[in-house]
Regions:
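Extended catalytic cores of very large enzyme megasubunits
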Residues: 1-144
Length: 144
């Protein structure tokens, strides 16, 4: 837990370090290990970062919305998805948990699918694909 106490301004909203007490030791350890940035000393700071990120569109932040989202997360009424909590408001990884892309029925489309998935996975995105247009098992792939 952070040594900071009470309500303080952070990233344009008010956070409450005392709300760390709502989390058990395992939760705090997991959040520190997997989700907090090095500069963040408390899960409350990560919740605020994600809330401000989720409330920003075209470089305009709705701080009242960010405050509400932070309040809901810090009261444990809901929790951010992993990519939002770990990557939202940062320059690392992608803030999206799952990409579903199309797989076509040609060598070029198949290899493009694998290249695209490699790029997405290396940026932290979950991946999947629609394979419905690929010919079935046992179907000839030659022209002769």
């Amino acid at each position: 837990m952070s040594e900071k106490k009470g309500e303080v301004p952070y990233l344009g909203i008010i956070i409450n370090y005392d709300k760390d007490k709502k989390l058990d030791k395992f939760s705090i350890d997991t959040l520190r290990d997997r989700y907090l940035w090095q500069e963040e000393s408390s899960p409350q700071e990560a919740f605020a970062r994600a809330a401000v990120y989720a409330s920003t569109f075209q470089e305009e932040t709705d701080y009242a919305m960010a405050q509400r989202i932070y309040n809901y997360a810090s009261d444990l009424w809901f929790m951010f998805s992993t990519p939002i909590l770990s990557n939202g408001g940062t320059t690392r990884g992608l803030p999206i948990s799952c990409f579903l892309n199309y797989v076509g029925d040609s060598i070029d489309e198949l290899t493009d699918h694998f290249k695209e998935n490699a790029r997405l996975a290396s940026s932290g995105g979950g991946i999947g694909g629609y394979w419905g247009d690929v010919r079935s098992d046992g179907t000839s792939t030659s022209n002769g």
